[in-house]
Amino acid sequence: MSCTGFWRKLASGEECGAAARLLGAVLAIPAALYGLVVRLRALAYARGLSTVRHLDRPVISVGNLTVGGTGKTPMVAYLARRLMARGKRVAVISRGYGGSLEGETRIVSDGRTIVLSAAEAGDEPVHLATSVPGLMTVIGTDRYTAGLLALEQLDPDVFILDDGYQHLRLHRDLNILLMDCNRPLGNGRTLPAGLLREPQTAVRRADLVVYTRCTGGKAPAVHGMIPSCRAGHALTGAALLPDGEVQPLAALRGLRGVACAGIAEPEGFFDALRREGLDIVAAIPFADHASYGEREVSTLREAAAGADYLITTGKDGVKLSAHLARLLPVYATVLEMRPLDPAPLEAALDKVL
């Protein structure tokens, strides 16, 4: 097991052997210091010591307390579709993490044309603009400034703040917190001893808690009196890049596939493909938000010897599109959020709009 894999098992509460206990003890002091700093930061915003900026449109924030994947991107896409179905012009504000323009404030898509590549803007805003036709996306480390740019040039009716739970500088009218249904708080400790970006008490800032990756049954009782609902994820198909139609994953059964993913928990993606009955002869995990340069492409070419196709996530697909001529046929999967009890979410949206 890699060091990263061991740490993730420790931080999620899955690893509790002697080595895990020793490492946990070593990390306890920096975790306590980190927790104190982020608690004081949140307190400064709550008490008005740090300035909170307001945009002249409703802002819906989607975020989490833990590092790693809780399904933020599928949730943002789901919300965007629901809002657009209500006739709203929707703009997503994203940081642009991993793109060459990270730190700049730029429009990624005006709802008609995607003007920046994934290499420039990062994978998530480009993937969202690609998968939700008509969605406007902007990037900026300062989300307030990015929102002002969108107001000036795009005139949206509502904003979705992607990964915004800790971006306290921007006021939000609806604060949605996503939590993994199976391990909502990991081992309950802050970084680097656990998965938490903030202490558990930060749950109180949420207006709605959505438990993700639920398969049925009751959700954990982490949310207290805060309204909550459950949601699951489903791979609903795959599209041949660059612009093929989405087809059922069953169409790939009987062929030999190589899977790759540069996401927080790639093994979950690989397992989902196998559950769909796909013959995955090699599964290659890359770093989260991998850039897919020469090294990654060479790795894929070597692994694909004797295979029929490559298959990856939607976020990875927007980056692999630049290398299609050098690879086997590449399929990008479609991952959808499916609320199991959507009434609390719809009620929360009604209050904002």
Curated annotation (Swiss-Prot):
Entry's EC annotation: 2.7.1.130
Cystines in this chain: none
Keyword annotations: ATP-binding, Kinase, Lipid A biosynthesis, Lipid biosynthesis, Lipid metabolism, Nucleotide-binding, Transferase
Domain of life of the native organism: Bacteria
Keyword Cell membrane: no
Annotated binding of ATP, by residue: T66, V67, G68, G69, T70, G71, K72, T73
GO biological process: lipid A biosynthetic process; lipopolysaccharide core region biosynthetic process
GO CC list: plasma membrane
Membrane-spanning ranges: none
SUPFAM superfamilies membership: P-loop containing nucleoside triphosphate hydrolases
Acetylation as UniProt keyword: no
InterPro entries, alphabetized: LpxK, P-loop_NTPase
Catalyzed reaction equations: a lipid A disaccharide + ATP = a lipid IVA + ADP + H(+)
Biological or metabolic pathway of the protein: Glycolipid biosynthesis; lipid IV(A) biosynthesis; lipid IV(A) from (3R)-3-hydroxytetradecanoyl-[acyl-carrier-protein] and UDP-N-acetyl-alpha-D-glucosamine: step 6/6
Alphabetical list of CDD domains matching this protein: SIMIBI
Record GO terms (molecular function): ATP binding; tetraacyldisaccharide 4'-kinase activity
Class of the enzyme per the UniProt entry, highest EC level: transferase
NCBIfam families xrefs: lpxK
HAMAP family given in the database record: LpxK (MF_00409)
Family to which the UniProt record says this protein belongs: Belongs to the LpxK family.
Function: Transfers the gamma-phosphate of ATP to the 4'-position of a tetraacyldisaccharide 1-phosphate intermediate (termed DS-1-P) to form tetraacyldisaccharide 1,4'-bis-phosphate (lipid IVA).
Protein name: Tetraacyldisaccharide 4'-kinase
Organism: Geobacter sulfurreducens (strain ATCC 51573 / DSM 12127 / PCA)
